Amino acid sequence: MLEHESKERQDAYEAVFTALAHPVRRRILITVYFNGGSMTAGQIAKKFEQAWPTTTRHLQVLEAAGLLRHRRQGRSRHYRLDCRRLELVRDWLAWFSRAPG
């Protein structure tokens, strides 16, 4: 962890990197991106061969990391990409490109 970063920011990095560590969650983000940036939970689940609770858990982790947001429409949950956390991580990674050595 970078000592100059706030605890809140460090927690945000941790949540994003944890979410992105799983290949299925990365594929979910890519799938949503290539489907216009928004999909229902049911549409996402159909793209992956796994149990519904597993898909739901992946969506919860992505949402907790701030990478997806959802809104309810009737009985459906519509998930939308939220790239602000990715920008935060991009800036964190850019810091290392300027590091000495």
Task: Label every PLM stretch briefly.
Residues H70:
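Short beta-strand "wing" residues that participate in macromolecule-binding interfaces
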Residues G66:
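Glycine-centered, phosphate/nucleic-acid-interacting loop/turn motifs that mediate DNA/RNA or nucleotide
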Residues D11-A51, Q73-R85:
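N-terminal helix-turn-helix DNA-binding core of bacterial DNA-binding proteins
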Residues M1-Y13, I30-F34, C83-G101:
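Amphipathic alpha-helical dimerization/coiled-coil segments
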Residues L59-Q60:
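Short, hydrophobic-biased segments on the C-terminal half of alpha helices
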